[in-house]
Structures are given as C-alpha cells and as structure tokens.
Amino acid sequence: MMAGIVACILLVFVTVITAQPQAVFLEYIQGRMGVLEERIAQWHDQSSRFSGELRDFKNQVLKMLENIEKERDSLRNEMENTNVRVNRLEREVDYIETQNPAPPCVEIDEKLSDHHGAKKKKKEKYQKITDCSDTISQVTAMKILKRFGSSAGLWTKDLAGNSDRIYVFDGAGNDTVYMYPRMKEFTLSSPTRKAAKIRLPFPWIGTGHIVYDGNLYYIRQDNEFQVIKFSLANKTIIDSAVLPIEQQVPVYGLSKFNYIDIVADEEGLWVIYATKENEKNICLAKLDPSSLSIEQMWDTPCPIENAESAFVVCGSLYVVYNTKLPSRSRIQCVFDVSGTISSENVPIVYFPKRYGSHSSMKYNPREKQIYAWDDGYQIIYKLNMKHRDELY
C-alpha cells in the first residue's frame, strides 16, 4: 500500500516537472504570435495610409497634367493669334512699301559717265547669246533647308548642268569644300558625315564662288585677287587669271569679305566687283568661262552702300539691299546690260523676313530659284518671272 502511494506521488511529481517547460514554451509562442499580430495590424495601417497618400499624389499629378494641357492649349492659341497678327502686319507693311516705294537707283553719276568716255560707250551695246527676256516680279516662296556652319557661307549646285550634287563653302575663308550627292544627304542632322571633302590647292576668300559645267571657279587672294578654275573631276587647276581690275574695294557694303562675286545666268558667267576709282557704285563684267578673260565691263548706277548681295538673271544685275540692323532684304536696283529694261518700270521686290543678312545669293538658271545663305541658315527662294514686255 505504501509502495502504491509513493508511486502515485512520484508520477504526480514527474508530470508537474515535465508540464512546466511546455507551459513556458506555449507562453513564449503566444507572446511571439501577439507581436506578429501587432506588427501585421501596424503594417495594414501603414499600407492603408500609404495607399491614401499615393491616391492623393496621383490626383494631384492628374490635376497638374490637366492644368498643363490647358496652359499648352492657351499658349498654342496665343501663338496662332500672334502668327495671324504678324502675317497681317506683314501684309500691311508690304502694302505700305508698295504704295510708298523707296526711290530706285536710276541716276548715273555724270562725272563717272564723262570720265570713262568713248571707251565705255563702245561696250554699252551687249549682244545677247540667248533669247531670255524674263525679269523678276516677285519672290513667291521661301524654303528653309537647315542651319549648318558659320554665319557666312555659300551653297550651290552646278549652275550649268543637271547634277543634283550640293557644294558647300562654310565660312568666308577656307581651303575645303563639302560635296553632297543629293539634297537629302545635306538635310540630314549630321550632314558632314555624308559629305565628301574636296581639298583645294589654294584657300578661297569670300563667298563669291561658283560651280559651273563641272568646274569650280573660286577667288584666291595672294598679292592680287585671282580667279582659279578647278576641275572637280580631276581635282586639278585648269586655269587661273588675275582680272584687269585695279584697287579693288569690297563690292557689298554689308558684306565686307566679298571683293569679287562670280555669278551665272542664262547668258553665262559674270563678275560683280568694285574699285576705288568708282568706290560708290558696283561694277559688272562678262567673263569667258573657257579663258577667264573679261569680255565686257560696265559701271552700274547701283550703290555699294547697304548692298548685301547681288545676282544676274537674263543679263540683268539685281542688287539686294538691307540695313546695318538687318530688316527685310529688297531688290532696289536693277541694271540691264542690253538696255531693254528701264529701272523706273522695275518694281522693288521684297524678300520674306528671315534671320539676319545674306552673305551669298546664287541664282540657278535651270530652277529659277536662289540658293541663299542667311546667318548660317540655308534658304531657297522661288522667283516669279514676267516677260519684259509686261513691264510697259
């Protein structure tokens, strides 16, 4: 009996001893579970708060985007209205300029005429090679191709051929010409990567150069100004000549880097220049493209002052004028070598407002367009022609 009681006491004691760690473990587990539940509840609270803040931020962004869209529409409307007003002002200015044109340059200096005498009178009559009888009545369109290079420069096609190649002279002095196979390559964002570089044997000066019938005619300045005829096919000099012109001065008052400007029209090659002897007005000469000899020379009534460029169309010299603070360029003086155009009957032609001033303007006889360089922008002007009989 006593043994049974002892056994029961031992069993109870062992049970108590083994049950105590289990209770501690359960209590520990319950504590950890409570902490986890608390953290989960806290995470839910934070998640709800963050969701609310994100929703508020999204609403703010949407509201800001809506306001930006409204402001953009408002700015677009303002720009359209401004453009309409500018166009209206341009038309009004054109009308005022048409009703009150600046006086054309028609008077010839009597002293200049007497000084040259019979020598010049012998060459007053010019025998035309073609039957071209067009004159410029209006600049009908302007196309801005791109902006490339320096503020001064020249770009042109071959003015006596059907080639689509583009030739670019960057700056007012260098020894490299860029050649592009087509207009597409020139208008690319990085055009120099598509260009073939032509290194000339002598550096060129000014922007009075030209590509004509596969040859490059450019101006070299040594002791005297020299015209170089360079074959683009063989990359060699074919001929060179010093023009019989003494004491040259800049031919354009607003483009001081140009002393000689070689241009082309339906009649062939011409040279526009100025001398100290006749330092007020521009001179013109007919150039033989084969021998580089001067065929005829004229003193024109067109002033050098405020001239920025010039070109020849059907044997008539058109001089483009501007102001020192660039405004709208205009053809204000016309000199016809055959004497069939009277300056009084030629209207003043205005060019569209652009960026600065023209450093070069090359007339393309085949396309009836002008390739111009305006403060680093390459521009094409389309011309509207009239028969000379329509002026009278």
Curated annotation (Swiss-Prot):
Main location: secreted
GO molecular-function term, one example from the UniProt record: identical protein binding
Domain named Olfactomedin-like: residues: 131-387
Disulfide bonds: 132-314
Keyword field contains Coiled coil: yes
Localization: Secreted
Coiled coil: 52-100
Glycosylation sites: 174, 234
Keyword presence, Transmembrane helix: no
InterPro entries named in the record: Gal_Oxase/kelch_b-propeller (IPR011043), Olfac-like_dom (IPR003112), Olfactomedin-like_domain (IPR050605)
Entry keyword set: Coiled coil, Developmental protein, Disulfide bond, Glycoprotein, Secreted, Signal
Any GO CC annotation of this UniProt entry: extracellular space
PROSITE patterns named among the record's database cross-references: OLF
Single Gene Ontology BP annotation: signal transduction
Signal peptide span: 1-19
Function, as annotated: Secreted scaffold protein that plays an essential role in dorsoventral patterning during early development. Stabilizes axial formation by restricting chordin (CHRD) activity on the dorsal side. Acts by facilitating the association between the tolloid protease BMP1 and its substrate chordin (CHRD), leading to enhance chordin (CHRD) degradation by BMP1.
Family the UniProt entry places it in: Belongs to the OLFML3 family.
Subunit structure: Interacts (via coiled coil domain) with BMP1 and (via olfactomedin-like domain) CHRD.
Name the UniProt record assigns to this protein: Olfactomedin-like protein 3
Species annotation: Xenopus laevis (African clawed frog)
